[in-house]
Amino acid sequence: MTLSVVRRARRNFRLTSGAACLNYALRRSQRHPERQFPAQGLPELREAIAHHIAYARGVHCSATDLLVCNGAQQALDLIARVLVEPGCQVAMEDPGYPPARQLFLALGARVQSVPVDDEGLRVEHIADGTRLIYVTPSHQFPLGMPMSEPRRHALLARAAELGALIIEDDYDCEFRYHGPAADALQRLDCHGLVAYVGTFSKTLLPELRLGYAVLPPAVLQAACVAKHLSDWHSPTLLQWALARFLGEGHLNKHIRRCHEVYSARRERILARLGSDLSPWFSAIPASAGFHLSALAKPGVDVELLANLARKVEVGLYSLAPFFSEAPIRPGLLLGFGAIELLDIDPALDRVRDTLQRLS
């Protein structure tokens, strides 16, 4: 039984609609066996993505503003390769997304760890000279809270003051469980300060590995060149299939179908954190995504707990690896993307029993 943040249950994906779209793509490929394809991505897929994110996330863009990538990680890589030079100052949330930090460091950047609070990134801590700011404003990773409206405006103002580009990683944004969803930060951007990154790998299937970036014109042209030099273009069959999948409304149906499943799992974990697990942990009230974070109360050894839980076949994951600087806030990431509803109580019973033995 795993409470992994990374894994997703594949049984929630309807194979019939996906297979029909893939068959369509195979038939289409036979009609264009020697056609050259744009590094930017197929126009029909970019049109479908632009329509989807305008409706779902309030993103202002057209198909010409989009670059199709092999997942969000390649989108981050291409943007960073275009903008980051050795010694370049990059700011990102702490705690934050380790692969983004590792990417910036690998390209020679100086990465500043900016603390977060209940309203998100603490903008006043962004250092002078920063050229790139990486944030997850809709659903802070890993803690889960959204960035407040005043903080969003402050971030845009600070980026304009610095002449910096903001990378908005809008991961896990499709699944929201209560309250109105805040639009993407990019919607507030009137000056081309935001590069918006998204992916279908988490919403649909991890194996899909298709993501996208909405980029300011100056960045887009260079990123398309970098994409071409990297791998020419993302897999054409998958692009045709996904364009069809989006165009026929299957994504929205999938989200509506899965929402009830994930919502029930989330509510069950919250109920346990608010009852018999409350002497040891307090939940951060995140309202979107596929995981919850729970902060440990004084005296709880999270690393020991995670190790002991694995011995009773429960996968637990500590918050510690997501912090780059002290003070680390001890706690757990509790993913509900892969675990079945009926397995949550048995898994958390074992966690509770382990905590009682440690107390």
Indicate residue ranges for each PLM-predicted region.
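N-terminal "arm"/small-domain region of PLP-dependent enzymes with the aminotransferase-like
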Residues: 1-40, 51, 311-314
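Conserved core of the PLP fold type I
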Residues: 22-162, 173-175, 180-191, 195, ...
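Hydrophobic residues in well-ordered beta-strands that form the structural core
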Residues: 92, 113, 168, 242, ...
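Conserved PLP-binding active-site segment of the aspartate aminotransferase-like
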Residues: 215, 293-298, 316-356
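Short beta-strand segments
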Residues: 4-5, 113-115, 134-136, 167-170, ...
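Conserved glycine-rich beta-strand-loop-beta hairpin in the small C-terminal domain of fold type I
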Residues: 260-270, 281-295
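Conserved core segment of the aminotransferase class I/II
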Residues: 190-193, 198-260
